[in-house]
């Protein structure tokens, strides 16, 4: 329809992602029973989506670009499991397409969705092509033709959804990845029309109770901004100051340094933290890092040259890993994968200059690769496929060697290509 002047606002965007969350809320248990995207993929996708939507719950950006960026940042950091990492990249591409926009035309919004699908495709390079990518490509093709025709956004999403439905006959309809991609677009369309059912998170009314047996979405709140600053006040009440900072942070490291007090914390509201700190003395050397983007992380007074970081599903495994020389433990299992943010946060510790990140399940691989993308040379990966292979790798670790040398030796010892 030529001459379409429809405008998509930030409120429209909120409804769409709320609709997608709602659809996953209805479908996640069914998706959990499917194969093709790892263990408990429905739960992981729901928790990833919950982290993304929580970032918008009290956001004040009225513009669609600001909302999209907040959502993408939270999704990348809150991504769990292989499916969650793919979905987070979809959001990241959408945000890229909406950067700097207060509102978007239907065409601009449709192109942003195409960006998102492109980003999702890039994160899964394996052959043969996974069903989630097959569906994504079909959706992108359907959206492309609708965008070229300058159709309203509901018709663009409808065309994309129909293309996805048509492509389902070429893949296993019981594949979890394919169902996830289809469910996402169906939810967006319902949300835009205001037709969604009792989401656990309501962007207009605040948080309400979730389904029985479902993780409380508030526990998936991510704090993806690393704030470091110095305060010139040697007489500061350290405990009172730290307690106030912890109101808006995952942790707060507060240390005296000569006439200054050094602060290092992770938060979802860096502005609030800086505003709090202003009241305690003159600020200088303020640095805010978005940890969901690639960043250089300097080690401040690290105690070790290189450390091992691994994932433990219970206390017994955690003790065994520590006995085998693992220095940092992240809690997680195949049914409850750790988020990218939890892995990155652990590697943000000043314990070591470099880290070797270990995996004992394929379900962790994409999240660890994302951590590597964000942290760069600060970490190296050893991606085993089971606990026995991980144990073989750990026996080759040498604390006197570099992280790069260790990772190479450990992969060779365990037969990891």
What are these regions (language model features)?
Residues 1-417:
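N-terminal loops that bind phosphate or other acidic moieties
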